[in-house]
Regions:
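Terminal accessory carbohydrate-recognition/targeting modules of carbohydrate-active enzymes
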Residues: 1-227, 247, 265, 336-453
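Substrate-binding groove/exosite segments of carbohydrate-active enzymes
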Residues: 158-162, 208-334, 340-342
Length: 453
């Protein structure tokens, strides 16, 4: 079953919520399921057919709805940092039905001892759930849990565990009422939900983080949502780098840099540099090279010169490919001219440029040329496309494509870094005859019959 991540930018600890609303920490020591006692029986979200899920705010809040008589039971889950500490999930259940029902949270921790008191649930000695409003009933162990559920909301079926590694808590929920618990995703303090940001605050906070990167506007709502969702997930992964191998970290760093999250990418690169490994030398060199090309940060180049040199040596020993031009540019910027000369003499294979996904459709560089919207899709014709602060090797690029009848108009601004020759801009996917060496401008492009529209 598919899962959605629960993580917080820069905070340790993480978890997952599956397609039915089952919540687990990353280590999977326990699982939290939700049930609703309505009418004549309990409905377990993980077993009901009428369950659907959606994401709010690029996936910062996951909403799961379960059909009950006269409406829906709605679960919302989001992750926050607990006072600067580890990630904590807030699990909220609300009644959007016309009649009251009972909500139950069921914790399963195979092989562990569970304990419930007035403030929460512990697995072993570790608190895993906390609440502000105590449940009206709680039980530990298969028999006691079944008796509680039978008494509070009708017949309960589908309990999987037979021992004391099962606990259940029940809250009555009148029409429009909600209850919530906080669930530990790491090791550290576990405040109750009232002491943590609510869903609206989390949505606003993530929007602020997303807006730190390059702004991209595409004439496709589904693609726009996917861009934001991917960005949120990349940023969230910076809080759980210990779960990723070096190649995965390199890919994460490149994606962050491509979308303008350079400070976050630098944090990932610091983690890569600290691992002192010989694995994935090509990927490491690409990540360091992309960061330098897209930021021009000389201090970062100096800081990363040593791990870059080590990765070059590892690549030479292993016969791995090396992205020669980006690495050479980084070494020269770091004042390592001798190392750059040695790189040119090495008998290594040059690395091909891998696919860059959506970014390759928005911008690309070829030598001293910058291609604007090189992958413009025919289905976008007539719709607005824009990018603001898109990182390139020549500096941040902003542009917009607007349509005037059959002709596209292009507005652009390149905040260029000093270079030996002027940068030439072209837009071959829109007008193969157009080019300009001006850093800013606007023009009405001609359409070509050879273009795919």
């Amino acid at each position: 079953m598919s899962t959605r991540p629960l993580d917080v930018l820069g905070a340790p600890g993480w978890g997952e919520v599956d397609a039915r609303g089952l919540v687990q920490p990353g280590a999977k020591e326990w699982a939290l399921d939700w049930w609703v006692g309505a009418s004549d029986r309990w409905r377990r979200a993980s077993q009901e057919a009428a369950v659907r899920q959606s994401e709010l705010g690029a996936g910062a809040v996951v909403e799961t709805r379960m059909k009950v008589p006269d409406g829906d039971a709605v679960q919302r889950v989001w992750a926050v940092a607990a006072g600067g500490g580890p990630a904590v999930a807030v699990v909220q259940v609300g009644n959007e039905a016309a009649t009251a029902f009972a909500a139950a949270l069921v914790v399963e921790a195979p092989g562990a001892a569970l304990a419930v008191d007035r403030t929460g649930v512990a697995v072993g000695a570790k608190p895993v759930l906390a609440w502000d409003r105590a449940p009206v009933g709680a039980a530990v162990g298969h028999g006691a849990v079944k008796a509680l559920l039978d008494a509070e909301g009708g017949t309960a079926t589908g309990l999987d565990h037979k021992g004391r590694d099962l606990a259940a808590m029940v809250w009555p929920l009148p029409h429009t009422a909600r209850m919530a618990v906080s669930a530990s995703l790491g090791r550290g303090a576990l405040p109750p939900p009232a002491d943590l940001p609510d869903a609206d605050a989390v949505l606003r906070g993530w929007q602020v983080h997303l807006e730190r990167g390059a702004r991209i506007e595409v004439p496709d709502d589904a693609l726009a949502r996917r861009i934001d969702r991917n960005r949120r997930r990349w940023l969230g992964r910076t809080g759980r780098m210990e779960t990723a191998d070096v190649a995965e970290l390199c890919e994460l760093s490149v994606r962050l840099d491509h979308h303008g999250y350079h400070d976050d990418a630098a944090v990932v690169l610091d983690e890569i540099a600290a691992r002192w490994t010989t694995e994935a030398p090509t990927e490491r060199l690409r990540a360091f090279g992309v960061h330098h090309d897209l930021t021009g940060d000389q201090q970062a180049a100096i800081r990363f010169a040593e791990p870059v040199a080590e990765a070059v040596e590892a690549a030479a020993r292993m016969g791995a490919e090396v992205p020669l031009a980006p690495v050479e540019r980084l070494l020269i910027a770091a004042g390592q001219d001798r190392a750059a000369q040695d790189l040119r003499r090495l008998d290594v294979r040059p690395a091909a440029t891998p696919s860059e996904g959506l970014r390759a459709e928005l911008v690309a560089d070829q030598g001293e040329e910058l291609l604007v919207a090189p992958g413009y899709r025919p289905v976008w014709r007539g719709g607005p496309l824009a990018a603001y602060g898109l990182p390139t090797r020549f500096g941040p690029l902003s542009y917009a494509v607007r349509w005037h009848g059959p002709n596209p108009a292009l507005l652009w601004e390149l905040d260029g870094r000093p270079g030996p020759v002027p940068v030439s801009l072209r837009a071959p996917a829109l007008d193969r005859s157009w080019s300009s060496d001006q850093p800013t401008g606007e023009t009405l492009l001609a359409t070509s019959r050879s273009l795919p529209w």
